[in-house]
Amino acid sequence: MTTTFEFLQPRIHGFATCCSSNSLLYSKASRFFNDRCRVYRQNPNRFVSNSITLPLQKKQVTVLRNHERFNLWDGFSRKKSRLVVNCQEDDQNESSSEEEESSQSTPAKSERKREKKEDKVWWSKGKKWQWQPIIQAQGIGVLLLQLSVVMFVMRLLRPGIPLPGSEPRIQTTFVSVPYSEFLSKVNSNQVQKVEVDGVQVLFKLRDDGKWQESETSRLSQSSESLLRTVAPTKRVVYSTTRPGDIKTPYEKMLGNNVEFGSPEKRSGGFFNSALIALFYIAVLAGLIRFPVSFSTSSTGQLRTRKAGGPDGGKVSGGGETITFADVAGVDEAKEELEEIVEFLRNPEKYVRLGARPPRGVLLVGLPGTGKTLLAKAVAGEAEVPFISCSASEFVELYVGMGASRVRDLFARAKKEAPSIIFIDEIDAVAKSRDGKFRMGSNDEREQTLNQLLTEMDGFDSNSAVIVLGATNRADVLDPALRRPGRFDRVVTVETPDKIGRESILRVHVSKKELPLGDDVNLGSIASMTTGFTGADLANLVNEAALLAGRKNKTNVEKIDFIQAVERSIAGIEKKSARLKGNEKAVVARHEAGHAVVGTAVANLLTGQPRVEKLSILPRTGGALGFTYIPPTSEDRYLLFIDELLGRLVTLLGGRAAEEVVYSGRISTGAFDDIRRATDMAYKAVAEYGLNQKIGPVSVATLSGGGIDDSGGSPWGRDQGKLVDLVQKEVTILLQSALDVALSVVRANPDVLEGLGAQLEEKEKVEGEELQKWLSMVVAPEELAVFVEGKQELLLPAQASSS
């Protein structure tokens, strides 16, 4: 025999549970468990989630019956009795009897004592006080709020009673008159009733209609018009204000038998006060039950995405799901994160080998390399809750909010464990606490960081929560956050190489379903975009499509990609701004000087790229001219000393051309070239160790006495002596490069003038026309000596004096 019963919602009063289907037992026990459970016969037709099926043989079934009594100090005291039922196969032979628990069984007696002790105070659990209200605060708040609203509406709908004893539901009109009118009516014995409240006087005439007919002309014009509008009303009450230096004519009113006094208080004062108190209690109960956050960036707004749900893995509410198939060019970083997702999907594969999941993974890389995209891919691939937020959401004006939000975030993640937390731009709250990267003290950020450290690997840490962090400033993070146990892995997301750039271009082209022309080779475009990040390449594809659409093309051609690359490097050509006169000639010779010197360097050094395009059209980036030298066809990770010196000479070729052509009358057009050359020369001397006088040392480390993370000035320990030497060597190197550039320009005067004149006329020179001029460039001996690193031979006087 099988019995199925379904538990219903519990009630506040006492209850009992039963496990039998005998009809006789049901009739006897229905008075105490009818509200608690519903009994079904054999082979039930339906089941519910909380139903239980019990096989019943020839045995006894014991049913507990709870008698509860509430005491204000002790809570609910329970008295238990047991109902013993003999269940057999035949329903007709079943019998039942009710008896108290046997006192002969020692284990049963001790069990009853323990249950009685535990149930005496029903809200005491494990020596911890836990108040469990009988009626939820939500119900109380809703009830009181509804009652308050109803009574408030009734109060508004109840008619006013301006004078005691007047008839209810009669429309009353108040007419304001001067105090002199009131005195006149009192003296003429026309006033029937007066109420005095300080200086406010309300009075009623003995015969309103007669007075209105006879005395209308004596009132003011405004009062007369008002009386005519209220002529049909049953009652008119006049109001006036007594001047402070005039007494109320009580003696005259007594003589005329006028009923007067102060206004009576309306009934219901206690009721109104109670109503207001109930309203505030309802509001308070609602706020306690449903706390309201006045911050727009609270952790309650953190987005939870679950794979497989309606919003599973979505980057935004209406966005599309990102998976690892959409990530290219960062294979190493993707492999690290795929392993974490695989661990969450199939933990037995690693647990049997003794492995544990990493507590945290820190994604480090330049802006645009794809750190957030990788996190979105994890959200799309993981079959666990994924909670994302920004570190800037933790810290606000109020002290303690940051730490509280961190606790709420991890509490939510632990509740849904296993889960993943992604904190973007984590350096906003995780800067080092030693003062090196802090301009001032910020206790709120430090409290937030301390709470984050505790949650990740503290006393109550939870390995079921994995934290992903993203930053492009890993050097400023606190060492306690970067240690193993918190961020076990530091994944560097680097700029993609040529193969990676080509893969990224293919992903974006296929994702946008971009129709490409026959002349488009994504491999050659990848070679043109050395140093581009994933975000740069995505923008490049979009810009190429926009340029093709602007020209009403059906396909995106190679020229569109080339123009998009130029826009990314130098900006957009200005159509309205054009150079004229002497400025146009100077800029043309300046760009021709870059081309001549760059070609001479490429003739000496094998494998160096050559100039492909010259332009003197102003661009939005601020450049008046543009010399395009494409990067090498293969990715380079090292820069040799001769290549570095050759780039220095090329950068100063424009300034050298201006000095030669205009006999020393130079312009400010070379300011960007000088800035870039100075930066390159400083790194060669102070960081790369390419200067013979200073030697192969790191100037910053040497001047500080070793690697020092205290945040002190790098020049503080030698009183600036080393920086003076570095400045002197940088100046000598730049001057030597300029002298060599002057030698190259003087060795090619015809090419400089001819190419400059043609560029001034056409504003843009490229292709075979440009290569015809550059094929005539020769490299002087001074250039060969300089790129070999023997610049001291070119300046013997300066070398000897130094």
Curated annotation (Swiss-Prot):
Gene name of this polypeptide: FTSH7
One GO location term (cellular component): chloroplast thylakoid membrane
The organism of origin for this protein: Arabidopsis thaliana (Mouse-ear cress)
Membrane association type: Multi-pass membrane protein
Enzyme Commission code(s) on record: 3.4.24.-
Cofactor(s) listed: Zn(2+)
Region Disordered, residue ranges: 87-117
Binding positions for ATP per the UniProt entry: 365-372
Ranges of Acidic residues composition bias in the record: 88-102
Pfam families attached to this UniProt entry: AAA, AAA_lid_3, FtsH_ext, Peptidase_M41
Keyword Zinc applies: yes
UniProt family annotation: In the N-terminal section; belongs to the AAA ATPase family. In the C-terminal section; belongs to the peptidase M41 family.
Annotated TM spans: 134-154, 268-288
Keywords: ATP-binding, Chloroplast, Hydrolase, Membrane, Metal-binding, Metalloprotease, Nucleotide-binding, Plastid, Protease, Thylakoid, Transit peptide, Transmembrane, Transmembrane helix, Zinc
InterPro entries: AAA+_ATPase (IPR003593), AAA_lid_3 (IPR041569), ATPase_AAA_core (IPR003959), ATPase_AAA_CS (IPR003960), FtsH (IPR005936), P-loop_NTPase (IPR027417), Pept_M41_FtsH_extracell (IPR011546), Peptidase_M41 (IPR000642)
Residue range of the transit peptide in the UniProt record, numbered on this chain: 1-55
Residue runs in coiled coils: none
Keyword Phosphoprotein: no
Free-text remark on how the cofactor is bound: Binds 1 zinc ion per subunit.
Binding site for Zn(2+): 590, 594, 673
Catalytic EC class: hydrolase
One GO MF term: ATP hydrolysis activity
Identification of the protein by name: ATP-dependent zinc metalloprotease FTSH 7, chloroplastic
Single GO biological process annotation from the record: proteolysis
